């Protein structure tokens, strides 16, 4: 289950990780064909929620979130290897119909995906619902995870290059990657090809009839299965 602010994507895979069922709910209702279904694993992926990173092991994480987003939010936490992800825990009517769901965030999934690649300098990004999410690595160390409001390619370009400049990443020696559709990859490659290393597409296996939301749901879903 991929939980976006604007919609919920329900996707079913078989034991061989083949894509078997997919539907989109814009009113957060549970799909009728899945009501009586039994699954060996159930995952809920939160994409792209408001979030803050905080040190591990603290008793109260509310201040880390409120300093960026105010106090009028319900929050949840997820521990990663280096930090705790404090994210907005928006309610969803469908959750009571799931059995023992594993809840995780896109931030945690992308962190593990990138760390396993082992590139000394890396920048990974994706754009959905007028936000660009960026994670950056420098000299083999994790340096940044953030989201920026980006309604168009000019704003996306600005924030990607801002991260490169602020972290002093070497433009010609960076593993530069996007998660998205093939059309997005082509467009962003042209946007950045004079400034950064060639842009890689993380999710080369595309879903038929794809959109940015379905591609992100498919990519993150395959990462956790």
Language-model-detected regions and their locations in the chain:
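Hydrophobic/aromatic-enriched cytosolic interaction surfaces used to assemble or bind macromolecules
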Residues: 1-225
């Amino acid at each position: 289950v991929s939980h976006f602010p604007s919609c919920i994507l329900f996707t079913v895979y078989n034991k061989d990780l083949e894509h078997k069922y997919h539907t989109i709910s814009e009113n957060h209702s549970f799909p009728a064909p899945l009501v009586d279904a039994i699954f060996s694993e159930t995952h809920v992926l939160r994409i792209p929620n408001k979030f803050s990173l905080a040190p591990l092991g603290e008793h109260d994480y509310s201040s880390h979130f409120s300093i960026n987003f105010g106090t009028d939010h319900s929050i949840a936490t997820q521990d990663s290897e280096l930090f705790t992800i404090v994210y907005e825990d928006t309610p969803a009517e469908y959750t009571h119909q799931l059995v023992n769901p594993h809840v995780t965030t896109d931030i945690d999934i992308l962190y593990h995906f990138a760390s396993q690649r082992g590139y000394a300098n890396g920048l990974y990004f994706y754009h959905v619902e007028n936000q660009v999410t960026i994670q950056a690595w420098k000299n083999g160390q994790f340096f940044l995870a953030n989201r920026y409001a980006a309604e168009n390619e000019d704003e996306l370009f600005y924030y990607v290059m801002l991260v490169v400049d602020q972290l002093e990443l070497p433009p010609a020696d960076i593993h530069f990657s996007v998660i998205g559709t093939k059309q997005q990859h082509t467009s962003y490659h042209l946007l950045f090809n004079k400034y950064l290393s060639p842009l890689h597409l993380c999710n080369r296996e595309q879903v038929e009839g794809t959109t940015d939301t379905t591609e992100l749901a498919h990519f993150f879903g395959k990462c956790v299965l």
